[in-house]
Protein backbone atom coordinates (compact mmCIF):
# COMPACT_ATOMS: atom_id res chain seq x y z
CA UNK A 1 0.00 0.00 0.00
CA UNK A 2 1.42 3.31 -1.08
CA UNK A 3 0.84 6.32 1.12
CA UNK A 4 -0.89 9.19 -0.52
CA UNK A 5 0.92 12.46 -0.87
CA UNK A 6 -0.47 15.49 0.99
CA UNK A 7 -1.47 17.17 -2.29
CA UNK A 8 -3.72 14.32 -3.56
CA UNK A 9 -7.36 15.31 -4.18
CA UNK A 10 -7.31 18.79 -2.63
CA UNK A 11 -10.98 19.53 -3.42
CA UNK A 12 -12.28 16.56 -1.45
CA UNK A 13 -10.06 17.37 1.50
CA UNK A 14 -11.17 20.99 1.44
CA UNK A 15 -14.84 20.01 1.43
CA UNK A 16 -14.30 17.61 4.33
CA UNK A 17 -12.50 20.31 6.28
CA UNK A 18 -15.36 22.77 5.70
CA UNK A 19 -17.94 20.20 6.80
CA UNK A 20 -15.97 19.43 9.94
CA UNK A 21 -15.65 23.13 10.73
CA UNK A 22 -19.39 23.69 10.20
CA UNK A 23 -20.30 20.65 12.28
CA UNK A 24 -18.02 21.61 15.11
CA UNK A 25 -19.25 25.21 15.23
CA UNK A 26 -19.86 26.05 18.93
CA UNK A 27 -22.91 28.27 18.18
CA UNK A 28 -24.63 25.44 16.30
CA UNK A 29 -23.88 23.04 19.13
CA UNK A 30 -25.49 25.35 21.68
CA UNK A 31 -28.61 25.76 19.54
CA UNK A 32 -28.87 21.99 19.10
CA UNK A 33 -28.71 21.42 22.85
CA UNK A 34 -31.47 23.95 23.43
CA UNK A 35 -33.64 22.27 20.78
CA UNK A 36 -33.15 18.87 22.36
CA UNK A 37 -34.16 20.29 25.74
CA UNK A 38 -37.39 21.68 24.25
CA UNK A 39 -38.15 18.36 22.60
CA UNK A 40 -37.79 16.59 25.91
CA UNK A 41 -40.15 19.06 27.57
CA UNK A 42 -42.79 18.57 24.89
CA UNK A 43 -42.61 14.82 25.11
CA UNK A 44 -43.16 15.05 28.85
CA UNK A 45 -46.21 17.28 28.28
CA UNK A 46 -47.67 14.74 25.83
CA UNK A 47 -47.05 11.98 28.30
CA UNK A 48 -48.81 13.89 31.06
CA UNK A 49 -51.76 14.79 28.81
CA UNK A 50 -52.31 11.21 27.64
CA UNK A 51 -51.91 9.75 31.12
CA UNK A 52 -54.02 12.52 32.76
CA UNK A 53 -51.82 12.66 35.77
CA UNK A 54 -49.29 15.09 37.22
CA UNK A 55 -45.56 14.34 37.20
CA UNK A 56 -42.74 16.08 38.94
CA UNK A 57 -39.67 16.84 36.80
CA UNK A 58 -36.60 18.26 38.55
CA UNK A 59 -38.68 19.15 41.62
CA UNK A 60 -41.28 21.19 39.71
CA UNK A 61 -44.89 20.06 39.44
CA UNK A 62 -45.96 20.30 35.80
CA UNK A 63 -49.57 20.41 34.67
CA UNK A 64 -50.47 19.65 31.03
CA UNK A 65 -52.20 23.06 30.69
CA UNK A 66 -49.65 25.24 32.50
CA UNK A 67 -46.73 25.37 29.99
CA UNK A 68 -46.23 28.23 27.57
CA UNK A 69 -45.93 25.98 24.58
CA UNK A 70 -49.21 24.32 25.36
CA UNK A 71 -51.00 27.65 25.55
CA UNK A 72 -49.53 28.80 22.20
CA UNK A 73 -50.48 25.61 20.45
CA UNK A 74 -53.97 25.63 21.90
CA UNK A 75 -54.50 29.20 20.65
CA UNK A 76 -53.56 28.15 17.14
CA UNK A 77 -56.01 25.25 17.28
CA UNK A 78 -58.84 27.50 18.40
CA UNK A 79 -58.19 30.00 15.62
CA UNK A 80 -58.18 27.24 13.05
CA UNK A 81 -61.49 25.89 14.36
CA UNK A 82 -63.12 29.32 14.24
CA UNK A 83 -61.91 29.85 10.69
CA UNK A 84 -63.32 26.58 9.52
CA UNK A 85 -66.70 27.10 11.26
CA UNK A 86 -67.29 30.84 10.55
CA UNK A 87 -69.23 32.12 7.54
CA UNK A 88 -66.45 34.35 6.35
CA UNK A 89 -64.14 31.49 6.57
CA UNK A 90 -66.55 29.35 4.63
CA UNK A 91 -66.22 31.57 1.58
CA UNK A 92 -62.45 31.41 1.80
CA UNK A 93 -62.41 27.71 1.97
CA UNK A 94 -59.33 25.77 1.23
CA UNK A 95 -59.10 24.00 -2.11
CA UNK A 96 -60.62 20.57 -2.35
CA UNK A 97 -57.31 18.88 -2.76
CA UNK A 98 -55.83 20.11 0.46
CA UNK A 99 -58.19 18.80 3.12
CA UNK A 100 -60.77 17.03 1.01
CA UNK A 101 -64.26 18.32 0.14
CA UNK A 102 -66.31 15.60 1.80
CA UNK A 103 -68.14 16.24 5.04
CA UNK A 104 -67.15 12.92 6.58
CA UNK A 105 -63.63 12.80 5.04
CA UNK A 106 -60.30 14.23 6.09
CA UNK A 107 -61.97 17.51 7.19
CA UNK A 108 -63.68 15.68 9.98
CA UNK A 109 -60.37 14.06 10.91
CA UNK A 110 -58.67 17.45 11.03
CA UNK A 111 -61.42 18.77 13.33
CA UNK A 112 -61.00 15.78 15.54
CA UNK A 113 -57.21 16.40 15.82
CA UNK A 114 -56.40 17.35 19.31
CA UNK A 115 -53.70 19.51 20.81
CA UNK A 116 -51.47 16.55 21.80
CA UNK A 117 -51.37 15.34 18.21
CA UNK A 118 -50.06 18.69 16.96
CA UNK A 119 -47.49 18.83 19.69
CA UNK A 120 -46.33 15.33 18.81
CA UNK A 121 -45.84 16.13 15.11
CA UNK A 122 -43.72 19.21 15.80
CA UNK A 123 -41.66 17.37 18.40
CA UNK A 124 -40.92 14.45 16.08
CA UNK A 125 -39.78 16.81 13.32
CA UNK A 126 -37.38 18.63 15.62
CA UNK A 127 -36.05 15.31 16.96
CA UNK A 128 -35.30 14.16 13.40
CA UNK A 129 -33.40 17.38 12.67
CA UNK A 130 -31.41 17.12 15.92
CA UNK A 131 -30.49 13.48 15.25
CA UNK A 132 -29.31 14.33 11.74
CA UNK A 133 -27.13 17.11 13.14
CA UNK A 134 -25.73 14.67 15.70
CA UNK A 135 -24.84 12.23 12.90
CA UNK A 136 -23.00 15.01 11.04
CA UNK A 137 -21.00 15.77 14.17
CA UNK A 138 -20.06 12.11 14.63
CA UNK A 139 -19.03 11.77 10.97
CA UNK A 140 -16.87 14.90 11.11
CA UNK A 141 -15.19 13.77 14.33
CA UNK A 142 -14.49 10.31 12.90
CA UNK A 143 -13.07 11.76 9.67
CA UNK A 144 -10.83 14.04 11.70
CA UNK A 145 -9.45 11.11 13.70
CA UNK A 146 -9.16 8.71 10.74
CA UNK A 147 -7.07 10.69 8.31
CA UNK A 148 -5.70 8.88 5.27
CA UNK A 149 -2.01 7.90 5.43
CA UNK A 150 0.34 10.56 4.24
CA UNK A 151 3.97 10.64 3.30
CA UNK A 152 5.89 11.68 6.42
CA UNK A 153 7.67 14.94 6.24
CA UNK A 154 11.47 14.74 6.22
CA UNK A 155 13.01 15.19 9.60
CA UNK A 156 14.88 18.47 9.99
CA UNK A 157 18.63 18.14 9.80
CA UNK A 158 20.53 18.51 13.00
CA UNK A 159 22.17 21.85 12.72
CA UNK A 160 25.56 22.52 14.18
CA UNK A 161 25.59 24.35 17.49
CA UNK A 162 26.02 28.05 17.13
CA UNK A 163 29.08 29.83 18.39
CA UNK A 164 27.23 30.96 21.50
CA UNK A 165 25.96 27.51 22.51
CA UNK A 166 28.18 25.95 25.19
CA UNK A 167 29.49 22.47 24.40
CA UNK A 168 31.92 20.38 26.47
CA UNK A 169 34.66 20.73 23.87
CA UNK A 170 34.21 24.50 23.58
CA UNK A 171 34.23 24.89 27.35
CA UNK A 172 37.41 22.84 27.60
CA UNK A 173 39.13 24.87 24.89
CA UNK A 174 38.10 28.10 26.59
CA UNK A 175 39.61 26.90 29.88
CA UNK A 176 42.83 25.90 28.12
CA UNK A 177 43.11 29.27 26.39
CA UNK A 178 42.50 31.09 29.65
CA UNK A 179 45.12 29.05 31.47
CA UNK A 180 47.52 29.54 28.56
CA UNK A 181 47.08 33.33 28.66
CA UNK A 182 47.49 33.39 32.41
CA UNK A 183 50.67 31.34 32.17
CA UNK A 184 52.08 33.60 29.45
CA UNK A 185 52.03 36.58 31.83
CA UNK A 186 54.12 34.78 34.43
CA UNK A 187 56.37 33.02 31.94
CA UNK A 188 58.98 35.80 31.93
CA UNK A 189 59.36 35.70 35.71
CA UNK A 190 59.56 31.96 36.10
CA UNK A 191 60.71 30.29 32.88
CA UNK A 192 61.90 27.10 34.57
CA UNK A 193 58.45 26.06 35.82
CA UNK A 194 56.85 23.44 33.58
CA UNK A 195 53.43 24.13 32.06
CA UNK A 196 50.26 22.98 33.76
CA UNK A 197 49.32 19.32 33.70
CA UNK A 198 46.12 19.86 31.71
CA UNK A 199 47.98 21.87 29.10
CA UNK A 200 50.64 19.18 28.74
CA UNK A 201 47.97 16.50 28.35
CA UNK A 202 46.24 18.41 25.58
CA UNK A 203 49.43 18.98 23.63
CA UNK A 204 50.55 16.24 21.24
CA UNK A 205 54.26 15.39 21.45
CA UNK A 206 55.26 13.52 18.33
CA UNK A 207 59.01 13.19 19.07
CA UNK A 208 60.24 13.12 22.67
CA UNK A 209 63.58 14.87 23.16
CA UNK A 210 66.05 13.17 25.49
CA UNK A 211 67.93 15.48 27.92
CA UNK A 212 71.29 13.95 26.92
CA UNK A 213 70.85 14.84 23.28
CA UNK A 214 70.02 18.46 24.07
CA UNK A 215 73.53 19.31 25.25
CA UNK A 216 75.34 17.55 22.39
CA UNK A 217 75.87 19.23 19.06
CA UNK A 218 73.69 17.82 16.33
CA UNK A 219 75.59 15.38 14.14
CA UNK A 220 74.03 14.30 10.89
CA UNK A 221 74.42 10.55 10.50
CA UNK A 222 72.77 10.05 7.18
CA UNK A 223 73.33 6.83 5.29
CA UNK A 224 75.94 7.04 2.55
CA UNK A 225 75.15 5.39 -0.73
CA UNK A 226 77.51 2.50 -1.60
CA UNK A 227 78.36 3.99 -4.99
CA UNK A 228 79.68 7.13 -3.26
CA UNK A 229 81.96 5.22 -0.93
CA UNK A 230 85.67 4.75 -1.75
CA UNK A 231 86.75 1.52 -3.38
CA UNK A 232 88.23 -0.05 -0.27
CA UNK A 233 85.17 0.54 1.96
CA UNK A 234 82.70 -1.23 -0.28
CA UNK A 235 81.39 -4.43 1.24
CA UNK A 236 82.44 -7.59 -0.55
CA UNK A 237 80.11 -10.51 -0.16
CA UNK A 238 82.50 -13.14 -1.55
CA UNK A 239 86.09 -11.86 -1.05
CA UNK A 240 88.75 -12.92 -3.51
CA UNK A 241 91.85 -14.25 -1.67
CA UNK A 242 94.13 -13.19 -4.53
CA UNK A 243 93.61 -9.51 -3.65
CA UNK A 244 94.89 -9.76 -0.09
CA UNK A 245 98.50 -9.33 1.04
CA UNK A 246 100.23 -10.25 -2.21
CA UNK A 247 98.40 -7.62 -4.29
CA UNK A 248 98.81 -4.83 -1.79
CA UNK A 249 102.48 -5.65 -1.21
CA UNK A 250 103.20 -5.75 -4.91
CA UNK A 251 101.42 -2.53 -5.80
CA UNK A 252 102.12 -0.46 -2.70
CA UNK A 253 105.82 0.23 -2.15
CA UNK A 254 105.17 1.71 1.26
CA UNK A 255 103.48 -1.41 2.56
CA UNK A 256 105.47 -3.32 5.17
CA UNK A 257 105.67 -7.10 5.02
CA UNK A 258 104.94 -7.55 8.74
CA UNK A 259 101.94 -9.87 9.26
CA UNK A 260 100.55 -7.81 12.14
CA UNK A 261 100.15 -4.68 10.03
CA UNK A 262 98.67 -6.73 7.21
CA UNK A 263 96.12 -8.20 9.58
CA UNK A 264 95.25 -4.76 10.95
CA UNK A 265 94.80 -3.28 7.49
CA UNK A 266 92.34 -5.97 6.46
CA UNK A 267 88.66 -5.17 7.03
CA UNK A 268 86.10 -7.37 8.74
CA UNK A 269 84.56 -8.28 5.43
CA UNK A 270 87.95 -9.47 4.10
CA UNK A 271 87.69 -6.91 1.32
CA UNK A 272 90.85 -5.83 -0.55
CA UNK A 273 93.07 -3.21 1.03
CA UNK A 274 93.06 0.22 -0.59
CA UNK A 275 96.34 0.74 -2.45
CA UNK A 276 97.72 3.70 -4.35
CA UNK A 277 97.21 1.94 -7.66
CA UNK A 278 94.19 -0.27 -7.39
CA UNK A 279 94.25 -3.43 -9.54
CA UNK A 280 92.22 -3.51 -12.68
CA UNK A 281 88.56 -4.28 -12.33
CA UNK A 282 88.61 -7.25 -14.71
CA UNK A 283 91.99 -8.67 -13.68
CA UNK A 284 91.55 -12.38 -12.94
CA UNK A 285 94.25 -14.39 -11.22
CA UNK A 286 94.41 -18.06 -10.45
CA UNK A 287 94.03 -18.68 -6.70
CA UNK A 288 97.14 -20.04 -4.93
CA UNK A 289 97.32 -23.51 -3.45
CA UNK A 290 96.17 -24.29 0.07
CA UNK A 291 99.77 -24.70 1.30
CA UNK A 292 100.77 -21.35 -0.12
CA UNK A 293 97.87 -19.56 1.56
CA UNK A 294 98.75 -21.13 4.91
CA UNK A 295 102.38 -20.08 4.61
CA UNK A 296 101.34 -16.58 3.58
CA UNK A 297 99.22 -16.23 6.69
CA UNK A 298 102.28 -17.18 8.77
CA UNK A 299 104.43 -14.58 6.99
CA UNK A 300 106.66 -16.86 4.92
CA UNK A 301 107.30 -16.03 1.32
CA UNK A 302 107.12 -18.71 -1.33
CA UNK A 303 109.26 -18.82 -4.45
CA UNK A 304 107.42 -17.51 -7.42
CA UNK A 305 106.16 -20.00 -9.95
CA UNK A 306 107.92 -20.05 -13.28
CA UNK A 307 105.54 -18.88 -15.91
CA UNK A 308 104.67 -21.54 -18.43
CA UNK A 309 105.93 -20.36 -21.80
CA UNK A 310 104.04 -21.76 -24.73
CA UNK A 311 105.69 -21.91 -28.18
CA UNK A 312 104.70 -19.10 -30.50
CA UNK A 313 101.97 -19.96 -32.99
CA UNK A 314 103.15 -20.82 -36.53
CA UNK A 315 103.03 -17.93 -38.93
CA UNK A 316 100.86 -18.76 -41.90
CA UNK A 317 101.94 -17.63 -45.31
CA UNK A 318 99.91 -14.68 -46.39
CA UNK A 319 98.04 -15.18 -49.59
CA UNK A 320 98.23 -12.74 -52.45
CA UNK A 321 95.32 -10.29 -52.69
CA UNK A 322 94.51 -11.60 -56.18
CA UNK A 323 93.94 -15.16 -54.92
CA UNK A 324 91.91 -14.16 -51.85
CA UNK A 325 89.08 -13.26 -54.20
CA UNK A 326 86.69 -16.19 -54.49
CA UNK A 327 86.32 -17.58 -57.99
CA UNK A 328 83.04 -19.44 -58.27
CA UNK A 329 81.83 -21.29 -61.37
CA UNK A 330 79.16 -19.41 -63.26
CA UNK A 331 77.60 -20.33 -66.62
CA UNK A 332 77.35 -16.69 -67.63
CA UNK A 333 81.07 -16.18 -67.09
CA UNK A 334 81.80 -19.32 -69.05
CA UNK A 335 79.68 -18.10 -71.94
CA UNK A 336 81.46 -14.75 -71.88
CA UNK A 337 84.83 -16.48 -72.07
CA UNK A 338 83.68 -18.65 -74.94
CA UNK A 339 82.55 -15.60 -76.88
CA UNK A 340 85.82 -13.71 -76.39
CA UNK A 341 88.87 -16.01 -76.63
CA UNK A 342 91.23 -13.15 -75.92
CA UNK A 343 89.72 -12.63 -72.50
CA UNK A 344 89.82 -16.36 -71.88
CA UNK A 345 93.55 -16.44 -72.64
CA UNK A 346 94.23 -13.49 -70.36
CA UNK A 347 92.24 -14.97 -67.51
CA UNK A 348 93.90 -18.35 -67.98
CA UNK A 349 97.33 -16.75 -67.84
CA UNK A 350 96.39 -14.84 -64.72
CA UNK A 351 95.14 -17.98 -63.05
CA UNK A 352 98.38 -19.80 -63.88
CA UNK A 353 100.49 -16.95 -62.57
CA UNK A 354 98.50 -16.66 -59.38
CA UNK A 355 98.43 -20.43 -58.81
CA UNK A 356 102.20 -20.47 -58.15
CA UNK A 357 103.05 -19.47 -54.58
CA UNK A 358 106.16 -18.04 -53.08
CA UNK A 359 108.09 -21.29 -53.42
CA UNK A 360 106.77 -22.03 -56.87
CA UNK A 361 104.04 -24.48 -55.67
CA UNK A 362 100.34 -24.06 -55.05
CA UNK A 363 99.33 -22.02 -51.98
CA UNK A 364 98.22 -23.88 -48.93
CA UNK A 365 94.88 -23.09 -47.30
CA UNK A 366 93.00 -22.17 -50.51
CA UNK A 367 90.55 -24.46 -52.22
CA UNK A 368 91.65 -25.55 -55.65
CA UNK A 369 89.06 -25.84 -58.43
CA UNK A 370 90.57 -28.31 -60.96
CA UNK A 371 87.27 -28.86 -62.82
CA UNK A 372 86.89 -25.24 -63.85
CA UNK A 373 90.53 -24.80 -64.87
CA UNK A 374 90.44 -28.04 -66.87
CA UNK A 375 87.33 -26.97 -68.71
CA UNK A 376 88.77 -23.58 -69.48
CA UNK A 377 92.05 -25.13 -70.70
CA UNK A 378 90.30 -27.55 -73.07
CA UNK A 379 88.12 -24.79 -74.47
CA UNK A 380 91.12 -22.50 -75.03
CA UNK A 381 93.12 -25.31 -76.72
CA UNK A 382 90.22 -25.97 -79.09
CA UNK A 383 89.97 -22.31 -79.99
CA UNK A 384 93.75 -22.00 -80.65
CA UNK A 385 93.79 -25.14 -82.86
CA UNK A 386 91.10 -23.62 -85.06
From Swiss-Prot:
Residues 170-180 have a biased composition (Basic residues). Expressed in vegetative shoot tips consisting of leaf primordia and the bases of immature leaves, the shoot apical meristem, and unexpanded stem tissue. Strongly expressed in tissues enriched in dividing cells: ear primordia and embryos. It comes from the Eukaryota. One of its GO terms (biological process) is cytokinesis by cell plate formation. The keyword Cytoplasm applies. It is found in: Cytoplasm; Cytoplasm, Cytoskeleton; Cytoplasm, Cytoskeleton, Spindle; Cytoplasm, Cytoskeleton, Phragmoplast. Residues 181-193 have a biased composition (Low complexity). Disruption phenotype: Mutant tan1 displays a shorter stature with smaller, more erect leaves than normal. Moreover, mutant leaves have a distinctly roughened, crepe-papery texture compared to the smooth surface of a normal leaf. GO terms for cellular component: microtubule associated complex; phragmoplast; preprophase band; spindle. Keywords: Cytoplasm, Cytoskeleton. Residues 375-386 have a biased composition (Polar residues). GO terms for molecular function: microtubule binding. Residues 83-105, 140-202, 244-266, 303-330, 345-386 are annotated as: Disordered. Is required for spatial control cell division during leaf development. Through an association with microtubules, acts both for the positioning of cytoskeletal arrays that establish planes of cell division during prophase and for spatial guidance of expanding phragmoplasts toward preestablished cortical division sites (CDS) during cytokinesis. This is Microtubule-binding protein TANGLED1. It comes from Zea mays (Maize).
Amino acid sequence: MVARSPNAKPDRQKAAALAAAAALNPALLRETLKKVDRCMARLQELQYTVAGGAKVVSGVSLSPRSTRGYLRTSLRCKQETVRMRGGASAQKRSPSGKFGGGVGGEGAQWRRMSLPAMLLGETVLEIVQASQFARDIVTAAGATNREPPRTPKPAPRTRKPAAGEPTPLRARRAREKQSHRGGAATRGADAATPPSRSRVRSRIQFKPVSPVAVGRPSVSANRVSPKNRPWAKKAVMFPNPTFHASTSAATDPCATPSPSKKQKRLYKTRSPVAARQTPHKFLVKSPPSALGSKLRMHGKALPARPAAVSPPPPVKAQASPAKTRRCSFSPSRLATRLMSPIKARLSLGRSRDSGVGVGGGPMSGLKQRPGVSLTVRTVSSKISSR
